[in-house]
Amino acid sequence: MTLFSSISSISNPMTSSKSSIASFGSGTSMGSNSIACGGGCGGGSGGILGLGLGLGLNLFGGSRGACGGNSGSGNPGNGPCSGGKCCGGPCCGI
């Protein structure tokens, strides 16, 4: 499964793991929709929490693909919610 290969790549000690922790708080405090959305938004480029909390979020292109824009790693965001907010994308429409 692609899930396992994704986990392998993010298991590397990147700064994204640190930023994903901060993004978890940011995502949950948003309270806009689900934790999965917040985790994915802030997870940045393959953040561990972005994948772990996002659960099925990676199906939409990884943690930064769903609600990109709010990513702690400085990603501009290339997802349906590139403004950093939940705007009715696949991650936010739930």
From Swiss-Prot:
Q: Which family does it belong to?
A: Belongs to the hssA/B family.
All disulfide bonds of the chain are none
A GO BP annotation: sorocarp development
Q: Where is this region: Disordered?
A: 1-20
Q: Which organism is it from?
A: Dictyostelium discoideum
Per its UniProt entry, which superkingdom is the organism in? Eukaryota
* Name recorded for this polypeptide: HssA/B-like protein 49
Pfam family, any one? Coiled
